[in-house]
């Protein structure tokens, strides 16, 4: 699976404007990869520490000079748009492929303006989610705000999520559509129209309170909260991939699968379940895997972050 991000900062000081292609922070890249696989308590590869994720309540722009913070402003969401090929549930079947999308795209823009009489010089701009994690940064060159001038900063991004026929990205909106498969697992949720990859990625960039209510994302999030019987995204516990299913048997993701009977076919079909608040949701399409006899096998999921 791929998550592609094309994003820019635009800095305006009086009549001078710079538009700069930014860099995603290593922390944010690891965060996305971790949330989509292990959940919100994951070991950050760059430090080895386990980092907890809480969906943000606010976004901020931060200006720095030689690495020292000189200004910080709340970011206002100016726009949020989606390009999702939503389909009527009547076109879907009770399986993991009929309503699956190859990709989906959303775009957003944040902005803030400093019209105070403050004076400062900065050479870098960053976008932060609360004080939890930096999303992106860019070097802007030495820039000075004087008493009678203003600074305006925007950050715009286009995010594309590609399933690569691995992650289940449904395009339907009828939440009564369920996978017709009974599993011996408490709190198994067989919803076929819940879009977990989109929910997880979008939550890192947009506080729930800012999501426009006429969007596909808002419907997805509000439905998830209702299923879990909670009232805010801050109560979400993203637990990552917890189980895999072969046939109608559920295995913990930490438990290897093995075939010791050489008369048995060694190609299996499986799908993964993602845990949220101890509920377990369909996360991938049906995957066909050929494994070696007598060799332990554990499903893995690779998430590629691509800066465009």
Swiss-Prot record:
Task: State the UniProt keywords alphabetically.
Answer: Host membrane, Membrane, Transmembrane, Transmembrane helix
Its subcellular locations are: Host membrane
Q: Where are the transmembrane segments?
A: 191-211
Q: How does it sit in the membrane?
A: Single-pass membrane protein
Q: Does the keyword Membrane apply?
A: yes
Q: What GO cellular component entries does it have?
A: host cell membrane; membrane
Q: What is its main location?
A: host cell
Domain of life of the organism encoding this protein: Viruses
Q: What is the protein named? A: Uncharacterized protein 55
Write down the species: Sulfolobus islandicus filamentous virus (isolate Iceland/Hveragerdi)
Q: Which gene encodes it?
A: SIFV0055
């Amino acid at each position: 699976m791929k998550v592609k991000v094309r994003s820019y900062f635009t800095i305006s000081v009086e009549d001078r404007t710079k538009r700069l292609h930014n860099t995603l922070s290593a922390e944010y890249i690891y965060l996305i990869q971790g949330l989509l696989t292990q959940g919100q308590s994951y070991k950050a590869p760059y430090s080895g520490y386990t980092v907890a994720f809480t969906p943000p309540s606010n976004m901020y722009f931060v200006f720095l000079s030689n690495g020292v913070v000189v200004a910080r402003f709340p970011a206002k969401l100016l726009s949020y748009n989606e390009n999702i090929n939503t389909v009527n549930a009547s076109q879907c079947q009770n399986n993991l492929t009929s309503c699956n999308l190859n990709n989906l795209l959303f775009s957003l823009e944040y902005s803030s303006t400093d019209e105070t009489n403050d004076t400062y010089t900065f050479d870098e701009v960053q976008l932060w989610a609360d004080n939890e994690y930096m999303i992106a940064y860019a070097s802007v060159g030495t820039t000075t705000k004087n008493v009678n001038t203003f600074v305006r900063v925007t950050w715009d991004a286009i995010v594309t999520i590609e399933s690569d026929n691995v992650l289940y990205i449904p395009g339907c909106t009828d939440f009564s559509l369920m996978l017709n498969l009974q599993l011996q697992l408490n709190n198994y949720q067989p919803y076929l129209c819940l879009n977990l990859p989109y929910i997880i990625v979008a939550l890192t960039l947009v506080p729930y309170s800012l999501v426009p209510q006429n969007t596909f994302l808002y419907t997805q999030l509000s439905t998830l909260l209702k299923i879990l019987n909670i009232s805010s995204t801050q109560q979400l516990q993203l637990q990552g991939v917890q189980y895999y299913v072969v046939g109608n048997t559920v295995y913990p993701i930490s438990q290897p699968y093995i075939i010791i009977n050489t008369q048995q076919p060694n190609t299996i079909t499986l799908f993964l379940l993602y845990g949220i608040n101890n509920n377990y949701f369909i996360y991938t399409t049906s995957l066909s895997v050929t494994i070696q006899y007598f060799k332990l096998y554990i499903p893995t999921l690779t998430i590629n972050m691509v800066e465009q």
